[in-house]
A protein has these predicted regions:
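Transmembrane-helix boundary motif in ABC transporter permease subunits
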Residues: 106-137, 321-330
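Membrane-interfacial helix termini and adjacent extracytoplasmic/periplasmic loops
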Residues: 70-93, 148-196, 276-278
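C-terminal transmembrane helix and the adjacent membrane-cytosol boundary/short C-terminal tail
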Residues: 207-211, 215, 222, 290-336
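Glycine-rich helix-loop "coupling/hinge" segments at transmembrane-helix boundaries
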Residues: 252-297
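Transmembrane alpha-helices
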Residues: 136-139, 143, 202-209, 213, ...
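Transmembrane alpha-helical segments of polytopic membrane transport and secretion proteins
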Residues: 1-46, 321-336
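Hydrophobic alpha-helical transmembrane segments of multipass integral membrane proteins
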Residues: 97, 101-109, 113, 117, ...
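Periplasmic/extracellular loop-to-transmembrane helix junction in inner-membrane transport proteins
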Residues: 23-41, 60-106, 126-127, 180, ...
Length: 336
């Protein structure tokens, strides 16, 4: 072998690693105008989002302070809403109770069914059924609220008589399910309608979470002799726990703020009823929608004050969800 071949076969001598200054210069040189524009747009979008949130909170807080400062009752605990007298007396106790009760009913009904549907689609349903069922669920998620409200008022409410009669006959002694034979435009009807509305939302998110379960986890459980249900219980559900919580909080957010469907179905009555079957009650969103157009300037400030409370509740719910997900992340294996 000649000398030229030997020189070609020799490895190049090692070079010293670049210094910190050289790395910074290289980074600046590699940043092209398009990268700088994209970085600026991305950063500006994030700042704009925070600015919009701050502007909404500031507007609500300012208008709410104008009303609360003149309220002659306790805004948080009063059971009346009368902004047309001097001094005005109004409070949100009835609205908070109705909003929480209807949302809890919706979550209790929707979450187990949604998780069951998601598990069926990802682990039990035949391939030929998955696509049609998934399409129907996606379609239900896209139905406008007013359509749900009209369906609830014209179809669901008339069908509640039988259910309410059965509950009153067998569970009326509890007081919660007693019925005075009035129109079934009650909190239970609203909760059932809200459950139907949030069901596709929770189902879609849970389905996508369950699809992300590593195949090796399920195969390992099957190799140990686990049944299909044991695989779901020991591998799928622990992995998707945080995702299901996120899906539930997303559905809860819609239930808390739902307006038109509730206003169409519920018979408004600014009072708290022990029974879930008797008509009456109210929610934050329903009260704002039904009174805002006819309210005076001060009355609108009072309604905005109730909207501020709903805004804070929504933030607290999402914050609690993030905290729960963060605590369970190490056990579930899913990304928060």
């Amino acid at each position: 072998m000649d000398i030229s071949t030997q020189k070609t076969d020799q490895a190049p001598p090692p070079t010293a690693p670049p210094t910190a200054t050289e790395q910074k210069r290289a980074a600046r040189g590699a940043t092209r105008p398009g990268d700088r524009i994209f970085l600026g747009l991305s950063r500006g979008s994030g700042i704009l989002l925070l600015a919009i949130m701050a502007a909404i909170a500031g507007f609500l807080a300012y208008r709410a302070s104008l009303a609360i400062s003149k309220d002659d009752a306790n805004f948080l605990t009063a059971f009346e809403w009368n902004t047309g007298v001097i001094p005005p007396k109004f409070g949100i106790a009835v609205l908070a109770f109705g909003t929480v009760v209807s949302s809890v009913i919706a979550m209790v009904l929707a979450v187990p069914i949604a998780v069951a549907i998601a598990l069926f689609l990802t682990h039990y349903a035949p391939r030929r059924l998955r696509s049609p069922i998934s399409y129907v669920i996606d379609l239900l998620a896209a139905v406008p609220s007013i359509v749900y409200g009209l369906w609830g008022a014209l179809i669901l409410v008339p069908q509640m008589d039988g259910l309410f009669g059965w509950l009153d006959e067998y569970l009326g002694w509890t007081g919660i399910f007693s019925w005075d034979q009035g129109a079934p435009r009650s909190m239970l009807t609203v909760g059932i309608l809200l459950a139907i509305m949030i069901l596709p939302i929770i189902t879609n998110v849970s389905r996508e979470v369950f699809r992300q379960v590593p195949q090796m986890h399920e195969e390992a459980a099957l190799a140990l002799g686990a049944t299909r249900w044991e695989v779901v219980r020991m591998s799928v559900l622990p992995f998707g726990r945080s995702g299901v919580i996120s899906a539930s909080m997303l559905g809860l957010g819609r239930a808390l703020g739902e307006t038109m469907a509730v206003a169409t179905v519920l018979s408004p009555d600014f009072d708290i009823h022990a029974s879930l079957l008797n008509p009456g009650g109210g929610t934050f969103a329903q009260n704002i929608a039904s009174k805002f157009n006819e309210a005076s300037e001060f009355g609108r400030d009072a309604l905005i004050a109730s909207g501020l409370v709903l805004f804070v509740i929504t933030l607290l719910v999402n914050g609690a969800a993030r905290a729960i997900i963060a605590r369970r992340k190490e056990y579930s294996g899913a990304n928060a």
